[in-house]
Amino acid sequence: MTQSPNVKTFDALFAELSERARTRPAGSGTVAALDGGVHGIGKKILEEAGEVWLAAEHESDEALAEEISQLLYWTQVLMLSRGLSLDDVYGKL
């Protein structure tokens, strides 16, 4: 699979989010979400999962891909908030 240079992989996104969590740049939505804790992040995951389902039922493939990307983002933020690594998850696949 060839990708444009602007396309992120799951691993690259996790590395980027890990760096934000470590460096805590001002104004970062990721940092704000991490500071808000697991409860708030979990609510976002439920919201995004519902939007994925609705997009699958009623929207275009492009809209569905966008919703899935948001669900993956929030899932990774939750992983970071709990201290999980990609290997922790990959080991369960």
UniProtKB/Swiss-Prot annotation:
Task: From the record, give the transmembrane residue ranges.
Answer: none
Q: What is its main location?
A: cytoplasm
**What keywords would UniProt list here?**
Amino-acid biosynthesis, ATP-binding, Cytoplasm, Histidine biosynthesis, Hydrolase, Nucleotide-binding
Compartments (UniProt record): Cytoplasm
What molecular functions are annotated in GO for this chain? ATP binding; phosphoribosyl-ATP diphosphatase activity
Q: According to the UniProt entry, what is the EC number of this protein?
A: 3.6.1.31
A single Gene Ontology CC annotation of this entry is: cytoplasm
Pathway(s) it belongs to: Amino-acid biosynthesis; L-histidine biosynthesis; L-histidine from 5-phospho-alpha-D-ribose 1-diphosphate: step 2/9
Catalytic activity line of the entry: 1-(5-phospho-beta-D-ribosyl)-ATP + H2O = 1-(5-phospho-beta-D-ribosyl)-5'-AMP + diphosphate + H(+)
Matching Gene3D superfamilies? MazG-like (1.10.287.1080)
Q: Keyword ATP-binding: yes or no?
A: yes
Output one GO BP term: L-histidine biosynthetic process
Q: Which Pfam families match?
A: PRA-PH
The family classification in the record reads: Belongs to the PRA-PH family.
Instruction: From the Swiss-Prot or TrEMBL record, give the protein name.
Output: Phosphoribosyl-ATP pyrophosphatase
The organism of origin for this protein: Mycolicibacterium vanbaalenii (strain DSM 7251 / JCM 13017 / BCRC 16820 / KCTC 9966 / NRRL B-24157 / PYR-1)
Q: Give the gene name.
A: hisE
